[in-house]
């Protein structure tokens, strides 16, 4: 018997377990899923099932942002990529599917708790009234966001939820360009040989190993970072702190723009006054850098790190850096470097050895905090980076605030929708029509409308 945790895509609610024998078919699984979800009104055979298998070949953890979005009825880009792929064939047995995808006990990937295993896609209109209400609420919420963004010009980016599309939009809104810069050979310093971080695994009841999540290991990897820069921390009166979930310390409104950045990061390196008086962290005293830790670094994670860097840079007076890392072979540094013409430039450099990365961090921490009085730019030297490394405060690089585009027709439609909704309540068909009009106004999507 296999216990599979299933989640219905686009419908708010927790994942639910379905017990099924490995020898039963995917068609049988569809029937079991329908039996567990009373609101599904279509025949079980019309359900579409997809394995919740991540890029790294593992099951989707239930605390992954994509899984959290599922619970809220949102469709994360990682989930969209999965349901755009190959669906589970109704004629295959569950064992066939797991074996073909290397998700078996023999491969160390048998389904277990705290994971999502099956994504369920239900054709539109296949739910009962309760779900229709939920879908209407979601649509109205989307129109609310369109109203804020199109009419009021407001945008809000939550760091941990920034998708590739949103990340590019943020950079475009602020006229920021990201440039990858080369690293160069450097004579290794003392103590440059550092072992990569070992992600902790635990043995569960059935004897299988499970890798703990980033959240569960924050204290442990904080100590790993602290151990490898401890001497410099002491000399510079700095410390490494882990930012607890729910502490949205990197929340800021971009000056002169209706853009808000919100959320937190994993680690901060800042004044050791915070170690003595933890509540002072809200003021970010002497902060030097943030560290965003991912067990598996993906290209899309760049945008989360960039969003966090922009927020931290705007919150403090001195230049800062961001590091995106798996604490093994991916150490990606970001910093605001310069302004060319009207665009701010954020530079990005990658290092693949922990020892070299810690040399960069140690060198960064001993740098003087501010730029000379007669210039906006600081130039510093860092090991492995091409010299000089330019640093600039983002406020100095942001372009002047320009006039908004001609969104008159869209604004009128959304304002008209709100006028009607304020008197008669939400109208789902009108909300859909407004959504379609906004979509058609976006060049990328106008081709398909």
Swiss-Prot record:
Q: Where is this region: DWL domain?
A: 57-116
Residues folding into a coiled coil are none
Effect of gene disruption? Leads to a reduction of virulence on soybean.
* Location in or out of the cell: Secreted; Host cell
Chain segments carrying region LQLFLAK domain: 18-54
Q: Which InterPro entries match?
A: Crinkler_N (IPR045379)
- Signal sequence segment: 1-17
Residue ranges of the region described as Effector domain: 124-449
Name the residue ranges of motif: Nuclear localization signal (NLS).
Answer: 217-223
| One Gene Ontology cellular component annotation held by this UniProt entry | host cell
Q: Which consequence is recorded for altering residue 328 to K?
A: Allows CRN115 to induce cell death in host cells
Which parts of the sequence form the motif HVLVXXP motif?
Answer: 117-123
Swiss-Prot/TrEMBL induction comment: Expression is the highest at the mycelium stage.
Alphabetized, the UniProt keywords read:
Glycoprotein, Secreted, Signal
Sugar attachment sites are 102, 341
Tell me the domain comment.
The CRN proteins have modular architectures that include a signal peptide, a conserved N-terminus, and highly diverse C-terminal domains. The conserved CRN N-terminus harbors a distinct LXLFLAK motif, which is followed by the conserved DWL domain. A highly conserved HVLVXXP motif marks the end of the CRN N-terminal domains and forms a junction where diverse C-terminal domains are fused. The conserved CRN N-terminus mediates the translocation into the plant host cells.
Q: What does it do?
A: Secreted effector that, with CRN63, is critical to pathogenesis by modulating host defenses. Suppresses cell death elicited by the P.sojae necrosis-inducing protein or CRN63. CRN115 and CRN63 may share the same molecular host targets that are involved in the cell death signal transduction pathway and that their differential activities are dependent on plant nuclear localization or not.
Oligomer and partners:
Forms a homodimer via an inverted association manner. Forms a heteroodimer with CRN63.
Family, similarity comment:
Belongs to the Crinkler effector family.
The protein's name in its UniProt record = Crinkler effector protein 115
What species does this protein belong to? Phytophthora sojae (strain P6497) (Soybean stem and root rot agent)
Q: What is the lineage of its organism?
A: Eukaryota, Sar, Stramenopiles, Oomycota, Peronosporales
């Amino acid at each position: 018997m296999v216990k599979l945790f299933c989640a219905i895509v686009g419908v708010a609610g927790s994942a639910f377990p379905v017990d099924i024998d490995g020898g039963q078919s995917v068609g049988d699984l569809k029937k079991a899923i329908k039996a567990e979800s009373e609101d599904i009104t279509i025949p079980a055979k019309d359900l579409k099932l997809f394995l919740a298998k991540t890029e790294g070949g593992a099951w989707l953890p239930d605390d992954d942002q994509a899984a959290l979005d599922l619970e809220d009825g949102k469709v994360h880009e990682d989930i969209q990529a999965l349901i755009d792929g190959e669906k589970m064939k109704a004629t295959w047995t569950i064992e066939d599917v797991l074996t073909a995808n290397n998700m078996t006990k023999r491969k160390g990937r048998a389904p277990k708790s705290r994971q999502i295993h099956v994504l369920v896609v239900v054709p539109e209109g296949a739910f009962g009234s309760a779900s229709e209400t939920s879908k209407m609420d979601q649509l109205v919420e989307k129109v609310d966001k369109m109203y804020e963004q199109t009419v009021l010009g407001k945008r809000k980016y939550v760091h941990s939820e920034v998708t590739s599309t949103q990340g590019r939009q943020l950079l475009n809104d602020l006229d920021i360009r990201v440039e990858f810069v080369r690293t160069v050979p450097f004579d290794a310093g003392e103590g440059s040989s550092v072992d990569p971080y070992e992600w902790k695994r635990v043995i569960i009841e059935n004897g299988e190993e499970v890798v703990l999540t980033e959240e569960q290991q924050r204290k442990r990897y904080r100590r790993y970072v602290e151990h490898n820069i401890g001497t410099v921390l002491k000399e510079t009166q700095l410390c490494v702190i882990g930012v607890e979930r729910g502490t949205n310390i990197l929340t800021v409104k971009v000056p002169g723009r209706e853009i808000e950045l919100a959320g937190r990061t994993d680690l901060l390196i800042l004044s050791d006054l915070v170690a003595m008086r933890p509540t002072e962290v809200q003021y970010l005293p002497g902060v030097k850098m943030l560290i965003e830790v991912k067990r598996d670094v993906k290209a899309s994670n760049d945008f989360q790190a960039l969003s966090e860097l922009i927020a931290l840079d705007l919150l403090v007076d001195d230049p800062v850096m961001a590091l995106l890392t798996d604490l093994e072979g991916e150490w990606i540094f970001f910093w605001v470097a310069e302004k060319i013409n009207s665009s701010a430039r954020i530079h990005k450099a990658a290092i693949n050895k922990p020892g070299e990365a810690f040399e960069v961090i140690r060198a960064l921490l001993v740098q003087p905090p501010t730029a000379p009085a007669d210039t906006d730019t600081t130039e510093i030297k860092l090991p492995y980076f091409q010299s000089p490394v330019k640093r600039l405060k983002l406020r100095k690089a942001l372009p002047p605030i320009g006039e908004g585009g001609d969104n008159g027709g869209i604004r009128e439609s959304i304002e008209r929708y709100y006028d009607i909704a304020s008197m008669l309540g939400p109208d789902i068909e009108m909300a859909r029509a407004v959504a379609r009009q906004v979509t058609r106004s976006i060049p990328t999507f106008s081709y398909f409308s």
